[in-house]
C-alpha cells in the first residue's frame, strides 16, 4: 500500500493538473500486487487473447460503450490500474475514468511490460 500512498500523495501536489498517474512497468507491478486494485486492459479482445497481464479485465476503450461498461462493473472510488499496447489508448481510458476512480496508467503499455517481465 506504500506505493499507492506515494503515487497519490504526488497527485495531491498537482491536483489541478494531474487527473491520473502514469508509471513504468516496475511501479505498475507494485500497484497491481494489491488485490484491491482493478487491473484493466483497454486493448481489443483479439489483443487481449494474444496475451495480457494476469488478472486483468478486458474492456476495449475504442468501443462506444467503454465508459458505460467500465463504470457499471467497477465500484466508484476504486483504484484502477490500466494499460493498452503502447500507452496511447490507455491515456484516453485514464482521462475517461479519472473523475470516478483513482487511476494508474502503465505508460509503456503491454510492450513495456513484456520487455520488463516477459509474458508471465
What kind of feature is each model-predicted range?
Residues 39-41:
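Structural scaffold elements adjacent to functional motifs in cytosolic proteins
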Residues 2-29, 37, 46-79, 88-120:
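Rhodanese-like catalytic fold shared by cysteine-dependent sulfurtransferases
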Residues 83:
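Short, surface-exposed ligand- or partner-binding patches at beta-edge/loop junctions that are enriched
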